[in-house]
From Swiss-Prot:
Lineage, highest ranks first: Bacteria, Pseudomonadati, Pseudomonadota, Betaproteobacteria, Burkholderiales
Listed Gene3D superfamilies: Imidazole glycerol phosphate dehydratase, domain 1
PANTHER family: IMIDAZOLEGLYCEROL-PHOSPHATE DEHYDRATASE, IMIDAZOLEGLYCEROL-PHOSPHATE DEHYDRATASE HIS7
Any one GO BP annotation for this protein: L-histidine biosynthetic process
Cystine residue pairs: none
Keywords from the UniProt entry: Amino-acid biosynthesis, Cytoplasm, Histidine biosynthesis, Lyase
Pfam families (UniProt xref): IGPD (PF00475)
Organism encoding this protein: Burkholderia lata (strain ATCC 17760 / DSM 23089 / LMG 22485 / NCIMB 9086 / R18194 / 383)
HAMAP family (alphabetical): HisB
GO cellular-component term (any): cytoplasm
Name of this protein: Imidazoleglycerol-phosphate dehydratase
GO MF annotation, one: imidazoleglycerol-phosphate dehydratase activity
Enzyme class: lyase
Stretches of the chain forming a coiled coil according to its record: none
């Protein structure tokens, strides 16, 4: 089983992430940021990743450090669970609609961190959640998972729908990329022989 647990403690946050890449989408989430919990639930359910996240952060200031550090810790946990990346499909993509919103996410477990994030949010906040923090979450993830990630919201009027389609598509793209390919068992999915 491809499981990992990572604990990250700083002066700003204390975070624990436990995941099973070959799960069924079960989750236990307590980040102290309700909208982030809602988005992590999308990753778990659509990625079929069993996911536990506990976070305590300086949310009395704002949610920035908690959201960013959860992204970092999730990236570390995914990288640890995948290990040497042998046998994975490496690439994944997904389009997800929600009413008027449509997003596309493409991921490459290349070993080269990179983020292209193009979401023209229609408002700055979803409830109390600052939509700019979604960029910080994904930046933290890509830098610590070692992936290239392209996120595009192709259309949308409702900011909640825009971001929810992004997280659902991310979960589905992640699931596709980390899936084991029986025909490539034990092989690194690269002509270089390493990722």
């Amino acid at each position: 089983m491809r499981v990992a647990e990572v604990v990250r403690n700083t002066s700003e946050t204390q975070i624990r992430v436990k995941l099973n890449l070959d799960g069924t989408g079960q989750q236990k989430l307590a980040t102290g940021v309700p909208f982030l919990d809602h988005m992590l639930d999308q990753i778990a359910r659509h990625g079929l990743v069993d996911l536990e996240v506990e976070a305590h952060g300086d949310t009395h200031i704002d949610d920035h450090h908690t959201v960013e550090d959860v992204g970092i810790t999730l990236g570390q946990a995914v990288a640890k669970a995948i290990g040497d990346r042998k046998g994975i499909r490496r690439y994944g993509h997904s389009y997800v609609p929600l009413d008027e919103a449509l997003s596309r996410v493409v991921i490459d477990f290349s070993g080269r961190p990179g983020l292209e994030f193009h979401v023209p949010f229609t408002r700055a906040r979803i409830g109390t959640f600052d939509v700019d923090l979604s960029i910080e979450f994904f930046r933290g993830f890509v830098n610590h998972a070692g992936v290239t990630l392209h996120i595009d919201n192709l259309r949308g009027i409702n900011a909640h729908h825009q971001l929810e389609t992004v997280f659902k598509a991310f979960g589905r793209a992640l699931r596709a990329a980390v899936e084991l390919d029986e025909r490539a068992a034990g092989q690194i999915p690269s002509t270089k022989g390493s990722l």
